[in-house]
Structure formats: structure tokens, C-alpha cells
Amino acid sequence: SVLLLEGQCVLGGLATSGLVNYWVPLCNGRGKYIIRGMAQELLRLSLAHSFNTLYPDWKQGEPDHETTQRSDTWFSGGMFSLALLKLLKDEGVEILYNALVSAPVMEGKHCKGVIIDGKSGRRFYPCRVLVDASGDASIMKQAGVPVTDGTNYFTYYGEGITLGGCRAAVEKKNIFLAYYHPYGGAANLHGQFQPEGKPPYMGCDMETINQYLQENQLRMYEKESGNCGMEQNIHTLPGIPQLRTARRIRGNATLTGEDCYRHCDTSIGTICDFEFRDRLYEVPYGVLVKDGFDNLITCGRSASASGWGWDVLRVIPPAVLTGQAAGIAAALAIAQDVPIADVPIEKLQKALADTGVIIHFDDSWVPREEADDGHAASKDHI
């Protein structure tokens, strides 16, 4: 049985209540899907009852010809949250909303379960395997798994609507055009537009999160208070901090930018690079686990990666891939009665490959040299 503990009141985390409802490319920038399996399944689910901003070559799925258009798209975070709930309930997953995980209960390095705080008070939920999908390794850290804090720039946005956008939406019959993003800080992931002299936010403790939220919200108020009224309005602020690289584990393996085009025997899947065409990485299983912690595993933004490797691994498509791998690994660990770090890698790879995941990239996809058009930053990604 599976119990999903959700601290918010909707599913999806940063991709939904966090308003980062944007798929970076799943493709190599040449017309080929690289990130497959559950990532493709959830991409289709997110667009089933939603607007999209797919380029023409990707409107009907993977094109039958080479293209430099990339497969990125915005989607409705609200509808995706609802669709995720329907999917999980249909699969028999038990979901507990508004359940704040306070602490893991440890016996040495073995997790007996977690304590949650909710409207009915404090409760204990036992577990055989625990997957930390918090995005900031909060459970892993409290359990004693070594972690590294990340840095985040002055970036924060909400969602609003304008009458001008509504007119365009009516004319083009496209509701997406009605929306706009009001910003607090507007720095990008490389630190461009970071205010001079302002240091990045380090980690994700309570003080840092409050500093980040309050500074950004006040900056947004300064920017928007003279604009909002009868013709323009902010209708949603993010429900969680929009911290991309808050904290990650120091796992049995660490993905870095130097791993580009390197094969890995313990790969759980091939991923692409949202800022560069062609670049490929095989994700080692070890980025999700740490020896000695026999029933703890993580995924998504808190997987073990550093430098550019962390940026490549943290975004939605690779996060889905590592989440899929973590779930399968948890089931294998229980079925095989082995520590989570020691699951048979061949069985894990086969289970992933059976869903379409590309475990090892084809060497023919590797260019002999960096192409002139290799840099292809996703236009809407921050």
C-alpha cells in the first residue's frame, strides 16, 4: 500500500501550487524525445484538459522529422492537480492532505515512520520504505543523511490577469493569453538581474524562507500597486516558496555537468539539457540513496547533484523520472527484502525501460563537436 502525505491542499508541489507550471523540453533539440516513461505520461495528463504553448512541430507528439523547435510548454497547474488526484485515487493510493511531516522516527539509520501534525493533532505513520519527495530533503536531513544547502536568487512571481490579455485571449481563442506573471525579484537561474550587493538566499531554514517570501512579496507590491485595479489584477500568489535548489542529499553518486555524454552502469534513465541541444546525461541510481540508510530514498530537486548538474536534474521532466525510479526501487526493496541502496539494478532498469525510459543513450546521438546552434535556453524558464 502507498500513503502520500501532502503538506499542501493540492498535489503537484512547485509545478502546481508553486506556479512553476512549465515543462522544460523533454527533447534533445533535434526532434527526439529523450526523457520518456512516466514523464511523457504526465506531460500528456497535464495537457489533456489544459491550454498549451507547444511549438507546431510538437503539437501531435514527437515529429517524424528533425526540428530545432523544443518540446517545452506551459500548462494549467490547477487542472493538473485535479488530474493527479484522479490518477492516484484510481491506482489505489491513499492521500492525506494538509499533513505536515514534523520528523522521522529513527532506530539507528532505519526509519520506523514519520510524525505528522494536522488538524486532528499529532499522529505517527509507520513505513517500510519512505520516499522523501519534499523538494528540500527535509526528512532525509532530520534522519541524519548528509545534505548540502543550495543557493537561490531573488526570484518570485505570481499569476494575474489583464483586460488587454482577455481581449487577446478572446480574439485568439486562447485563455493562456489572458494571464501574466507579476514579479517580485526577477533574477534568473544564472543570477542575471540579481540586485547589486544582494547575496543569494542560502538553504531553506525557517528564517531564510521568511526572508525570501517577505522581501519578494514587498517588492511585488512596490511594482504592482500602481498597476492593479479595474483592468489588471493579481489573483494568485505561490502557495510554496519558489526555491529551486534549496537542499539536496550527498548520495552514493552525484550528477555534475562533467557527466555530459558519459555512460553509467547504474543509470536509471537518460535526460536532456533544457539550455543546450544535444547534451545527454545518464542519471546514476546512487543520486537517490545513501548507504546505511536502508529504507530511505529521495527524488526530484533533492537528488544528489551539484553545479550545472543540479539544475539539469531538478526540473520537472527529470524530477518525474527520478520519482518513478524511487517508487519502483521502493517496491523492489520490499519485495526482495534488501536495503534500498542494494536493489538489483538490472531489475530496476528493466522495470523503467518497460515503460519507455531510455536507460542508455545511443552514441550516434552524440555530436562530434558542439553545434553552432547548441545553446537553446528555454525562453520561459527562470
Q: What function would you assign to each model-found segment?
A:
Residues 7-103, 107, 148, 157-158, ...:
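Conserved N-terminal/central alpha/beta ligand/cofactor-binding core
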Residues 14-16, 38, 42, 61, ...:
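Flavin (FAD/FMN)-binding glycine-rich loop and adjacent Rossmann-like elements that form
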